[in-house]
């Protein structure tokens, strides 16, 4: 009787192990891979070759790891493009602001670039508020320097030098910004930002990798980016953006052997003609010779 019937086994669904593996995701999903070796060496050496090496790692990761979880790639976490240092000053600013539903919405995690499980295991901070330290710090850069959502909404163009994973850009749009947002970064990092911000539905973001495409903005934001560039590139970038109205620059004093405090005071500030420049020390970030905000208004 059985020979009268044929049976077709239902194919079992194939599960992408990369989507369910516990975070962090190492290069090639292997803690002992060549990519991981490069990453560790770059971090330990931390010299002028750091970013050339990390660009290779990110390029390889983009080909072999899921973009849906790029925020828990080991490369992303190690730079870090996703901050996990829980500074109470930023947390205070964020929680105070979150009493306003506009800020609370901007701080709420969207789970783009991570799974809900990733958030719970790696980034979760509160039992009743799904946010991340990265989002709190992004908003903190604005609030610490006097940029509330009304001021952000009044702007038409914002330029960010080194956009991280795109959280500051996402925050700005969720605060009600409707203008054009330019992110200048390495192509390998732009790919991550574009995935994040396009998925989030932000249509007016320009991802640029050439100084030729830089435009003056109502606000330029450069958090640990302008002051990590080679000196000759800094000059080109600042000259291109010299007509920008306002700046927020966060920097640490010593990076790759360069005295950033001297560069800020002797090179950058003299180029800001007819503007008020103010430097504030961030005492809760004492590493690398001290950390500072410079505002130009």
Where are these regions (language model features)?
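N-terminal accessory regions of S-adenosyl-L-methionine
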Residues: 1-138
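Conserved alpha-helix/loop element of class I SAM-dependent methyltransferases that forms part
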Residues: 135-155
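Conserved class I S-adenosyl-L-methionine
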Residues: 154-164
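Conserved SAM-binding loop of SAM-dependent methyltransferases across substrates and taxa
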Residues: 165-177
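S-adenosyl-L-methionine
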Residues: 195-214
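A short SAM/SAH-binding and catalytic strip from SAM-dependent methyltransferases
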Residues: 220-232
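A short, conserved alpha-helix within the catalytic core of class I
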Residues: 229-241
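Conserved beta-strand signature within the Rossmann-like core of class I S-adenosyl-L-methionine
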Residues: 244-256
């Amino acid at each position: 009787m059985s020979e009268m019937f044929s049976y077709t086994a239902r194919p079992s669904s194939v599960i992408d192990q990369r989507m369910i593996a516990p975070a962090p995701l190492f290069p090639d999903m292997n803690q002992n891979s060549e990519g991981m070796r490069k990453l560790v060496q770059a971090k330990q050496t931390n010299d002028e070759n750091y970013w050339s090496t990390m660009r290779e790692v990110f390029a390889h990761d983009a080909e072999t790891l899921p973009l849906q979880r790029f925020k828990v790639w080991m490369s992303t976490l190690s730079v870090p493009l996703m901050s996990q240092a829980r500074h109470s000053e930023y947390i205070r600013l964020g929680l105070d602001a979150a009493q306003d539903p506009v800020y609370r919405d901007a701080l709420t995690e969207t789970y783009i670039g991570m799974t809900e499980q990733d958030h719970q295991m790696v980034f979760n901070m509160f039992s009743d508020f799904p946010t991340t330290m990265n989002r709190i710090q992004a908003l903190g850069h604005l609030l610490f320097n006097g940029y509330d959502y009304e001021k952000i909404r009044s702007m038409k163009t914002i330029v960010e030098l080194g956009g991280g994973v795109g959280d500051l850009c996402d925050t700005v749009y969720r605060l009600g910004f409707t203008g054009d947002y330019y992110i200048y970064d390495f192509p390998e990092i732009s790919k991550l930002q574009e995935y994040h911000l396009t998925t989030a539905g932000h249509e007016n973001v320009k991802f640029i990798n050439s100084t030729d495409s830089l435009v003056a903005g109502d606000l330029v934001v450069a958090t640990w980016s302008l002051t990590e560039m080679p000196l000759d590139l800094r000059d080109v970038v600042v000259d291109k953006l010299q007509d920008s109205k306002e700046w927020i620059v966060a920097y640490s004093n010593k990076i790759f052997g360069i005295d950033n405090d001297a560069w800020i005071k002797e090179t950058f500030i003299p180029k800001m003609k007819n503007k008020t420049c103010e430097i504030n020390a961030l005492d809760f970030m004492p590493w690398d010779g001290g950390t500072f905000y410079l505002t130009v208004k």
